[in-house]
Amino acid sequence: MAASRNSPPNSLPDRVAAFIAARTTPNERLCVGLSGGCDSVVLLHVLAACGLGDRLQALHVHHGLSANADCWAEFCAEYCRRLGVGFLTEHVTVDRNSALGLEAAARAARYEVFARRAGDLLLLGHHRGDQAETLLFNLLRGAGVAGTAAIPAERRQQRLRILRPLLDVAREEIEAYARDHRLDWVDDESNCDTGLTRNFLRHQVLTVLAGRFPAAERNLAQAAGHFSEADALLGELACLDWQAAVDGDALKLAALRELSLPRLKNLLRYRLRQLGWHAPAAARLDEFSRQLQTAGADRHPALDLAEGSMVAGRGVLRWVGRG
C-alpha cells in the first residue's frame, strides 16, 4: 500500500496508509462513514489517494433532521461517483423527543445502520479536536477512566471493527488538505448551534482555552491517550480477577470479598461491558459493591439494571437478563 507519488514525506496520505496497513489485510473491504462534512470527505479522498479505491465503499446515513438532508445525500453520491467509489445510503427516523437527547438519538440510529450495512470494517473521520471535545464532555459528566479514554482509534462493536485514521490529526490540517485539493463539502447548519453541548464546547470552551493554552487541544487528546492506557490496564486486572473468581457464568462471592472495594467495582464494570449492559450510576454501584462485601449468608443483594439484574445468592453472583 502506498500513498500518492506526489505526496511529501510524512504527508497525511502517508500516515493514513501506514495506519491502514498496520490494522488491515490487503483483501479487507473498507467502508467509510460519509456524512459529506469536511472530515469524512477528506478521509475518503486520502484513502483513494493511497491507492485503496478498489477496496473502498462509502455509507451515508440520511437522518432527515435538516431541510438540506436530501442535498447532502446527493452530494455524497456525486462525490463517490467522481472518485469511483461504491456508495450506499439509508434513511433513518430519529425521535426528536428521545430521552437520550437529539444528538445521542441520532448517533444511536447512525451506528445501528453502520452495524447492519458496513460489513466488517468501518472507517470514521473523527480527528484530534473531536477527541478533545469528547474528553471534556465526559469529564463534565463525571465519567470514570473508561469515559475519559474518550474516542479509541480502534474498537470492536460485536462483529464490526471501527477504525479512526484521522484521530491524531488536527482539524486545521484536515481543512488545509481539503483546500489544497480543492475539495467541496457540506456544512451542517446544526454545527453552529451552541445550544448543543458539543458545539458549545467546540466554539466557546475550547476556543477560550486555546487563547490561554495554545496547545490545549493537543494536550487534551494526549491525556485521553493516557486514560486509554490506564483503562486497558484496568481491563487486564479485571480479567485476572474474573479468572480467579469465575464459577461457570457466575462469580464466587468468597473471592469477591477478598478484593478491595475499587477492585471489586472495576470487576463488576468489566463484566457489564462484556455483556453490553449499561453501568449503573457510581453511587448505586458503590452501594451494591459494599453490600456484596458485607452481606451475611442469609442476605441476597441485587441490583436492577435496564438490561437485567445482578443477583447474589447460594455463594455466587449472577447476571440475569430480562426475558
Predicted features along the sequence, with ranges:
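AMP-forming adenylation/ATP pyrophosphatase catalytic core
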Residues: 2-39, 55-59, 63, 92-96, ...
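Core alpha/beta nucleotide-donor-binding catalytic domains of modification enzymes
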Residues: 2-207
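Alpha-helix boundary/capping and short turn/kink residues
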Residues: 141, 145, 210-214, 232, ...
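Mid-to-C-terminal catalytic subdomains of enzymes
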Residues: 175-225, 229-232, 300, 312-315, ...
